[in-house]
Curated annotation (Swiss-Prot):
Posttranslational modification: Not glycosylated or contains very little carbohydrate.
Chief location: virion
This protein's UniProt keywords: Host endosome, Late protein, Membrane, Virion, Virulence
Protein name: Virion release protein
Length: 630
């Protein structure tokens, strides 16, 4: 989903201010301040967390543009038939790569392999790619539009790569036409998901209930940006690292290299297989910069919000405390935990201003209080959830809750998706975004769950290792690939196409709970194509004693959302799962559990909208745990 679409689906009304400052619909990167001290980076990959964690108080600097360096994930597989091929990336280079592989064009394959990390080439148009082919003496394989050849008399060079461009649901798709004579433009696209591969046994791992003691090798750090040198890149002015290290340099590459050298020194000194770098709002600055530049350094890899030191195999976890804390900024976070009022400005207009700041302020004090806050925060989470340690792979509060429940229940028969095919299938089945019908205005009203737990406690959740089938069994939990057709009189469908929510005919992935709900609501034609199904199911949230102790014994806190405890319980009760859905592919996750949690909530919400009091209302936006209406 493009950045503009995600902003439109957001609960916050931030799109209009962004457009005022120059944001365009095709932009995919935003640099903006949120207050006098904090600069963040918004991309298509972190915008769900932006709208969850950030409160925009003051925009004093704003810049947006389209960057070819931003790579977004796509849960769909390519469309590959006998007559045509459509890459899910929409990249023309991927069409050339596919043709080189299928037709065994070794010269073209070698040329493409040498350009694997060339983002500009990957996003090139037909003219630019043909220039590249000419440069490499490969013009025989040039891209030619099917509209420019005579199909009837077959008067075209068979070595050329024939391309068609179609518009489906308002989007343009590039197609490699394999068979010019037999080809017809598809009316609608069925993006396939490899469900058979997703169910392969080694793509699912047992959920470990072990947890390590709190890692002692924890270091707070911050990146400080400067804004004067370029419009389309963040310039790192300095890096602060606990306890008192200040890293500066000639340019971004030099500063990051010194930073990585410092980390390497820590790794060898501590002789540990893991260390933890912690901070606040890392997702919106530090992680984005590291992911952008780390490929330049052969001894390091950035993967799944962590750095890996190739020589030793040491993992450097990047732990963003903001994900486990109410919406705030670094100043408010430190004040909450230490009572200390400090400025935490993370950007300067000029390099000279940053240099003056470093010379005239105690950076060591700043980083010390951030370190102290992070330690107290993590220790508080351990105490509240009665953990024996802390896992820096925890994706969010729901992840911690489910882990603690499983430990209490001592149930070890849950498998989580590990391989990208299985992860992508689970993500495709989770519908947490808004179905937006109209814009929010001053007359809009919101209906929000105070607690989702009465809905999800009675529900069943997958257990065991899933298997493949085309005929799901009644009473079993499954996730199905379906062809769906929606009646035109349904304004707010429970089954919809994520890529184009206005589509009335599409292929989608839904849980058995979603499908059962749609059947009961009526107005849907559903054809199940294939499924992933679980052999067993359990009531995960039926440990009443533990949940009562967790929520009821802390009820005094739940009325005060400014306290950490109050925020934790309010957040969990309302069923917010943004960060858990964004769980990294290599980490332990709860995606199949979350998929059914969301489905049980959607089941209740959409049935509620059938009640007369809401049926006559004008629904503006709707998602699993809230409805906005007029």
């Amino acid at each position: 989903m493009a950045l503009i679409e995600q902003l439109q689906s957001s609960e916050q009304s931030i799109l209009s201010p962004f457009r005022y400052y120059g944001f365009k619909d095709f932009h995919n990167v935003i640099f903006t301040t949120i207050d006098d001290e904090t600069l963040i980076v918004i991309t298509v990959n972190n915008v769900p967390l932006v709208t969850r964690l950030i409160t925009f108080e003051k925009i004093t600097f704003f810049r947006s543009f389209n960057s070819t360096c931003i790579i977004t994930s796509n849960n769909n597989s390519d469309i590959d038939t006998d007559t045509y091929f459509i890459p899910n990336s929409l990249s023309l280079l991927d069409i050339l790569k596919k043709r080189a592989y299928d037709v065994e064009l070794r010269d073209l394959s070698f040329a493409i392999m040498s350009e694997m990390n060339n983002d500009e080439l990957r996003n090139s148009d037909i003219v630019s790619l043909n220039k590249w082919l000419h440069k490499h003496n490969l013009l025989d394989y040039k891209l030619v539009l099917i509209s420019d050849i005579d199909r009837r008399y077959k008067l075209y060079n068979k070595k050329n790569t024939i391309i068609d461009v179609i518009s489906v649901n308002g989007r343009n798709y590039n197609i490699w036409v394999k068979d010019v004579i037999e080809y017809y433009s598809p009316e609608y696209l069925r993006w396939s998901i490899d469900i058979k591969r997703a169910t392969e046994s080694n793509n699912w791992l047992p959920y470990s209930q072990s947890i390590n003691p709190l890692n002692e090798n924890i270091y707070a750090f911050e990146f400080i940006a400067t804004l004067e040198r370029s419009n389309e890149r963040l310039n790192i002015g300095a890096i602060f690292l606990y306890p008192d290290i200040i890293i500066t340099g000639r340019n971004n590459e030099d500063i990051i290299e010194k930073f990585l050298d410092q980390l390497e020194e820590v790794i060898y000194k501590k002789n540990s297989d893991s260390i933890v770098l912690t901070g606040y709002h890392l997702t919106f600055l530090e992680n984005t910069i590291l992911e952008r530049y780390i490929s330049k350094y052969k001894d390091w890899i950035f993967t799944c919000n962590r750095l890996v030191h190739c020589k030793t195999g040491t993992e450097v976890f990047l732990f963003d405390a903001a994900i486990f804390f109410p919406s705030s900024n670094k100043k408010g976070y430190v004040k909450h935990w230490t009572g200390k009022k400090l400025n935490f400005k993370n950007f300067f207009q000029k390099d000279s201003q940053l240099e003056k700041y470093i010379n005239n302020n105690s950076v060591a004090e700043r980083i010390y209080y951030l370190q102290s806050s992070l330690h107290k925060h993590i220790s508080c989470l351990i105490e509240i959830f009665e953990l024996n340690g802390f896992d820096f792979n925890f994706s969010g509060l729901l992840d911690i809750l489910i882990f603690s429940i499983r430990v209490k229940n001592n149930n070890g028969n849950y498998y989580y998706p590990k391989h990208s095919s299985a992860v992508n299938l689970m993500l495709s089945s989770i519908y947490t975004d808004y179905y937006a019908i109209d814009d929010i205005d001053k007359d809009s009203k919101k209906l929000v769950f105070n607690s989702i737990f009465p809905l999800i406690m009675e529900g069943y959740y997958p257990e065991g290792k899933p298997y493949y089938t085309k005929t799901p069994k009644e009473g079993y939990l499954s996730i199905c690939l379906c062809d769906v057709e929606i009646s035109n009189d349904i304004k707010n469908p429970i089954l919809y196409c994520k890529e184009n929510k206005s589509a009335r005919k599409f292929t989608g992935v839904f849980t058995s709970v979603d499908i059962d709900t749609a059947v009961k609501l009526r107005g849907y034609k559903i054809k199940i194509l294939e499924c992933i199904e679980w052999p067993n199911k359990i009531k995960l949230f039926d440990n009443i004693c533990y949940l009562n102790k967790l929520f009821i014994e802390h009820q005094d806190y739940t009325h005060d959302e400014k306290s950490l405890q109050g925020y934790l319980f309010s957040y969990l009760l309302k069923g917010n799962v943004t960060e858990d859905v964004l769980a990294m592919k290599s980490c332990r996750n709860n995606l199949s559990i979350i998929s059914f949690i969301i489905s049980y909530c959607r089941n209740y919400t959409y049935k509620l909208l059938e009640c007369p009091v809401y049926e006559s209302s004008n629904i503006v936006k709707c998602k699993y745990n809230q409805v906005i209406y007029k």
